[in-house]
């Protein structure tokens, strides 16, 4: 049995991300078999007891994750040139939506410290729908990190044009983009003008390129689900907290 970095053990235990673990080690908030770990890169056996002190656990519990229904014309990431408006600018108390349809409406205060709130994944400027922003490295890891390989992302895509049954089969499995063979997708007609796409990967403008290859023009693209979390009745431009009952 080999030793591994304590930061990796903490991440595997779901207590924090590796980056967060390193910060807690620097602050003296990590214990190994009851003793404070004071050196980055310290290794241990998985059979040893690795834990976070109360202050670190509290800090983790205070980290926010929000679901935003991003409108078209907003970018998902920060723009250093300030040429475009970032979606994070919509995370304001005025845009907060606490749906009464949720089993347990959030008790979190919509006025919260947004430091470190970053998008977990991207959504094109000309696409709308579900965008996750989080302060929690564990959530980011689930959506865009090592654990994201099996996370489904569902989209409603308004298209113009007609395709054959063989074209539809090609969209489901068989397309190569930029010399890369895409993973199988689930693509079905929602109605005569709209396709439903379910992907387990998210390459740059993937859906638009897939549609273009079979002669379809995309007139609108909206993400409605990531993993087990759905956009549901969240209005465009509004946001809510990820509830305690939800997990990706």
Give names to the regions the model predicted.
Residues 2-248:
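Basic, flexible Lys/Arg- and Gly-enriched helix-loop patches that mediate nucleic-acid binding at interfaces
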């Amino acid at each position: 049995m080999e030793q591994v970095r304590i930061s990796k053990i903490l991440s595997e235990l779901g207590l924090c991300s590796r980056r967060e673990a390193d910060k807690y080690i620097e602050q003296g908030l990590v214990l190994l078999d009851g003793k404070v770990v004071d050196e980055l890169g310290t290794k241990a056996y998985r059979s040893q007891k690795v834990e976070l002190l109360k202050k670190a656990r509290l800090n983790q519990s205070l980290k926010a994750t929000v679901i935003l229904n991003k409108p078209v014309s907003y970018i998902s990431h920060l723009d250093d040139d300030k040429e475009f408006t970032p979606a994070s600018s919509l995370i304001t108390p005025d845009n907060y939506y606490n749906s009464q349809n949720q089993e347990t409406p959030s008790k979190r205060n919509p006025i919260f410290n947004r430091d470190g709130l970053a998008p977990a994944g991207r959504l094109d400027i000309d696409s709308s729908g579900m965008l996750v922003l989080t302060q929690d490295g564990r959530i980011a890891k689930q959506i865009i990190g090592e654990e994201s390989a099996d996370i489904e992302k569902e989209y409603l895509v308004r298209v113009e044009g007609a395709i054959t049954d063989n074209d539809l089969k090609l969209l489901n499995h068989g397309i190569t983009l930029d010399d890369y063979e895409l993973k199988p997708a689930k693509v079905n007609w929602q109605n005569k003008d709209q396709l439903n796409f379910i992907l387990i990967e998210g390459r740059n403008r993937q859906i638009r390129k897939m549609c273009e290859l079979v002669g379809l023009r995309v007139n609108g693209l909206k993400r409605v689900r990531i993993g087990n979390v759905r956009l549901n009745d969240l209005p465009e431009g509004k946001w809510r907290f990820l509830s305690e009952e939800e997990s990706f």
